[in-house]
Regions:
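Boundary/activation segment at the start of structured domains
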Residues: 1-3
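Electropositive polyanion-binding surfaces
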Residues: 8-172
Length: 172
């Protein structure tokens, strides 16, 4: 077990080129992230969309380093987790956690995505887990997201939907 993972520079360059060449037109979803102020490893994002016939779609998009680092899986599993002390010690090399795999604003990225669809009665009518391409519209910190979106009609509609869903589960 080495303290630092060493990855071939050619592989890193190829992976950087790959994510750089992802086209926005190839992206299935436009997403946003919400993280603590100053975060560098932005590893989850979301999209909310109201579709026809009052169908609500929620997407949870998770950065997936294994898409790039399959050959390092054994070492990654032995490392176990990212450590947050007074200094962030990433599970994988910074170039991956803070760049290649990080869901950076105005970038296209590959993710593992969970797509859920609900009707207006909060019944889950569709679900899919898949690898997808996403475009990151905006990186928010918690305060900025709340200031810009929390009181918006659109976001309040989603809050009401989530409350109905939560209450329906309590009644079950």
């Amino acid at each position: 077990y080495q303290k630092k993972m060493t990855i071939d520079k050619n592989k890193i360059n190829n992976d950087i080129e790959y994510v750089t060449n992802l086209k926005k037109s190839d992206c299935e979803y436009n997403i946003f992230t919400i993280d603590p102020k100053g975060s560098k490893d932005l590893d989850d994002g979301f999209h909310f969309e109201k579709k026809e016939n009052n169908i609500f779609e929620i997407g949870i998009h998770i950065a997936c380093p294994i898409l790039f680092l399959k050959e390092y899986l054994h070492e990654i599993l032995n490392r176990c987790c990212t450590v947050y002390t007074n200094k962030n010690i990433n599970l994988i090399p910074d170039i991956y956690s803070e760049n290649i795999c990080s869901l950076l604003e105005k970038k296209n990225r590959k993710t593992m995505s969970i797509i859920l669809q609900f009707n207006e009665r909060c019944e889950c009518i569709g679900q899919e887990i898949k690898e997808s391409s996403v475009y990151i519209m905006k990186n928010y910190d918690y305060d900025t997201f709340d200031e810009k979106h929390y009181n918006s009609d659109r976001f309040q509609e989603w809050i009401q939907l989530s409350e109905r869903y939560f209450n329906s589960k309590l009644d079950s």
